[in-house]
A protein has these predicted regions:
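N-terminal nucleotide-binding beta1-loop-alpha1 segment
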Residues: 1-26
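Short catalytic helix/loop segments, enriched in acidic residues and glycine
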Residues: 27-45
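Short, acidic, metal-binding catalytic loop of nucleotide-sugar glycosyltransferases
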Residues: 47-54
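Short, charged/polar "capping" segments at the starts of alpha-helices
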Residues: 64-70
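Short phosphate-binding loop-to-helix
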Residues: 72-120, 131-132
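Short aromatic-hydrophobic micro-motifs that form the base-stacking/packing surface
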Residues: 121-125
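The conserved acidic donor/metal-binding loop of glycosyltransferases
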Residues: 126-130
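Conserved core of the sugar-phosphate nucleotidyltransferase
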Residues: 132-228
Length: 228
C-alpha cells in the first residue's frame, strides 16, 4: 500500500485519564503502571516524540500526577515535541473533545466552524501500549486516507496476533476480535479523526462505556441507550 499522507503532520492526544468507565489494573490507572521503573505513559510519550508526522503532544489525565511522572522521568516538555498536559474531564469523550478544542487555540473553547477547522484531524493514542513503536505510528499516519475519510482506525489481523497466544510451556495472551467478512481483527486503538466532522458525538461515550460486549448486561444497556 502506498503512502497517501507522507508529508502531513498532526497533533496527538494521548488519553491517560481515569473515570468510572476506564479499566483499572490492580485498582490503579493503567497510565501509571510501571515497567522497569518507568510508567506506561512515559513510554508512549517517548515513542510519540520520535514520530516525524506528529507536531504537538497533548496528554490528558490527572494533571498533577502526570507532571510528577514527567518531572521524575526527566521528560523535556518542549523538545523534540512540545508536550501539553491537560486536566481530565468526567469521561473519555469529554477528554478528547475539550483537548481537541485546546489544540485549536480556542481559549474560550467555542467551536470554530470554518472548513479548515472541520477538516483538521488529530491522532488519538491510548496510554496502555508500551510496545508501540515510532515506525508503527508513522506507517499508520502516512497511510490513513484522510482526504476521503473522517475517521481511520488501526486494525491487526488475528493471524498476526497468534504469535502471542499461549504455547506449550510458555505463557501468552488471547484477545477478543472484531469479526467481519474479510477476516477477524483486533482494533489497535490508533485513531486518526476529524472531530468536527463526526455527527452524533453523544453516542461515543455510550459505546465506550458499554464496550465489553462479552458482558451481556453491557450489550443490553447499549442497545437500550441507542434504541430505547
Amino acid at each position: 500500500m502506498s503512502s497517501v499522507n507522507s508529508h502531513k503532520k498532526y497533533d496527538a492526544i494521548l488519553v491517560a485519564g481515569e473515570g468510572k468507565s476506564s479499566y483499572k489494573v490492580h485498582h490503579q490507572n493503567k497510565a501509571f503502571l510501571t515497567i522497569n521503573g518507568k510508567c506506561l505513559v512515559h513510554y508512549i510519550v517517548e515513542t510519540l516524540q520520535q514520530v516525524e508526522s506528529i507536531r504537538d503532544i497533548y496528554v490528558v489525565g490527572l494533571k498533577d500526577e502526570l507532571q510528577q511522572v514527567f518531572l521524575t522521568g526527566h521528560v523535556d516538555l518542549s523538545f523534540p515535541k512540545r508536550i501539553h498536559i491537560v486536566e481530565q474531564r468526567s469521561n473519555l469523550y469529554e477528554n478528547v473533545w475539550h483537548t481537541f478544542l485546546k489544540s485549536l487555540k480556542s481559549e474560550n473553547e467555542e467551536v470554530p466552524y470554518t472548513e479548515s477547522h472541520r477538516d483538521q484531524a488529530m491522532l488519538i493514542v491510548p496510554c496502555d501500549a508500551p510496545l508501540m513503536t515510532p515506525q508503527e505510528v508513522e506507517y499508520f499516519t502516512s497511510h490513513a486516507n484522510m482526504e476521503n475519510y473522517d475517521h481511520v482506525l488501526g486494525l491487526v489481523s488475528q493471524k498476526k496476533l497468534k504469535y502471542f497466544y499461549p504455547q506449550e510451556g510458555k505463557p501468552g495472551i488471547k484477545m477478543a476480535y472484531l469479526h467481519i467478512k474479510e477476516d477477524s481483527f483486533r482494533i489497535n486503538n490508533l485513531h486518526l479523526v476529524k472531530p468536527l466532522r463526526i455527527e452524533n458525538r453523544e453516542y461515543i461515550q455510550k459505546m465506550y462505556q458499554y464496550r465489553y460486549q462479552r458482558n451481556f448486561k453491557n450489550l443490553v444497556l447499549f442497545a437500550l441507550s441507542i434504541f430505547g
